[in-house]
Amino acid sequence: MAVDAQTNLQKLNHLIEKPSSLFQLTKTQLYNKILDNNEGELTELGAINQLTGQYTGRSPKDKFIVNEPSYRDAIDWGSVNQPIEEEKFLRLSDKVLDYLDQKDELYVFNGYAGSDQDTQLRLTVVNEMAWHNLFAHNMFIRPSSKDEAEKIKPNFTIVSAPHFKANPEEDGTASETFVIISFKHRIILIGGTEYAGEMKKGIFSVMNYLLPQQDIMSMHCSANVGEKGDVALFFGLSGTGKTTLSAAPDRKLIGDDEHGWNKNGIFNIEGGCYAKAINLSKEKEPQIYDAIRYGTILENVVVEEDGNVDFDDNKYTENTRAAYPIDYIDNIAKPSKAAHPNTILFLTADAFGVLPPISKLTKEQALYHFLSGFTSKLAGTERGITEPVPSFSTCFGAPFLPLNPKRYAELLGQLIDKHEVEVYLVNTGWTGGKYGVGRRISLKYTRRMVDAAIKGELKNAEFEKDEVFGLSVPKDIKDVPKSILQPINAWSNQDAYREQAQDLISRFVENFKKFGDDSKDIAEQGGFKA
């Protein structure tokens, strides 16, 4: 039986407005609900820890975009953007709304995505679980008052029902879990997973569709700004160091994961941070550690009986997380925007151990590496990943890009030219051998190299080409051992290094074929040669 979209909308409005849907609860009220409902446990740091059960990371194979005529031609359909028919979406959302209508209480948050008011999304988030609502409160941009929240007329709504399981045969999903985006109905429908990151990444996917349509670049990156107004962007996939490297004591954080770049400069899409918490220590990452307090949500961290948190224990997953409002970081830009960037850093965790720890890129090389998006998938950020796997994620964010990647590359190229931005490739992965043989590049050295790039120390530095990749590598950086700058020198067997490097080059070349003749110039002018 066909489901009418208007009926769905009425059901959704009914859910939001019914007295048992608790609207815009404070942090304290949500804490009380979380503890009363036995959803989470209080830690000695004051943060609440949540165990998300079966799903401790995103489920990319369970993500769909509704195949709607007005949007069909713009979407880059494939394994990332899987289509689902509108009728199936409406039927499933009808079931989810009926399911939520049976609940004693629901939790509703109104807020925003995007700190630039001209392009801001107005959001309503409807949650089955109180802790998911606190997550939304922490991660999206919060209105200044309940009065302001009540006046928000949403142009996108998240409906999250983690305990609702889909029937794949009937509902057209890949499993009992689903994350479905409808641009026509302006809804993100989530079910079958308690992993809260699906909400934030769902909205990021939406912004990655909407912003480029207005000639605004959307980016999977962190950003910070120095005392003189100099802005740096850090691109990279989960676990490559975006959050860690952008949290610098002498620079103000703009945001740790999602940004837009328009005619005025950079703006944060979010109102919070979602930091990896595995092996977190006050010594290594003081800003993040100090943000873990009352109001913060920890995901899948091990908590001892006395409430003490063991950040080193990966019993549940490597992908432990901390979600906190951005103002829990002392050193932030207010509001979360800044001028045009001076420096862009592409972060990659190279599990082969062959890329230089830092190299300077031409614009053509920058576009090649942006489209390639090479990194290694790190343990726990997706289901089934237990050790690093070399992978290519277009634009350092393929799972979240609804449009053809060339659109994002085109925008980036124009902006690099217009604002004369310096671009660097930074390997935060391995040196002296591949994963299992070599060692992870020291965070202390990576911080120093990044600092040198951002502060302009490398502008007049001497560079030399590395013999295999042809990348421009600085000959010397203060307080960084010369032995690691040229990666071949860090390997005990240089022939083994060359063989491993050629293996990686062949993977780059093979991967880039998917972009076809349209990107041939980028490959010829900026690409690796087999």
Curated annotation (Swiss-Prot):
> Which UniProt keywords are given for this protein, alphabetically ordered?
ATP-binding, Cytoplasm, Decarboxylase, Gluconeogenesis, Lyase, Manganese, Metal-binding, Nucleotide-binding
Biological process, per Gene Ontology:
gluconeogenesis
User: What cofactors are annotated for this protein?
Assistant: Mn(2+)
Substrates-to-products reaction catalysed = oxaloacetate + ATP = phosphoenolpyruvate + ADP + CO2
Q: Which residues are listed as membrane-spanning?
A: none
What top-tier enzyme class does this entry carry? lyase
Q: Which residues bind substrate?
A: 58, 195, 201, 321
Top-rank taxon:
Bacteria
Q: State the family named in the UniProt similarity comment for this chain.
A: Belongs to the phosphoenolpyruvate carboxykinase (ATP) family.
Task: Tell me the PANTHER family matching this sequence.
Answer: PHOSPHOENOLPYRUVATE CARBOXYKINASE (ATP), PHOSPHOENOLPYRUVATE CARBOXYKINASE ATP
Q: What does this protein do?
A: Involved in the gluconeogenesis. Catalyzes the conversion of oxaloacetate (OAA) to phosphoenolpyruvate (PEP) through direct phosphoryl transfer between the nucleoside triphosphate and OAA.
Kindly provide the name given to this protein in its UniProt entry: Phosphoenolpyruvate carboxykinase (ATP)
What gene is this protein translated from?
pckA
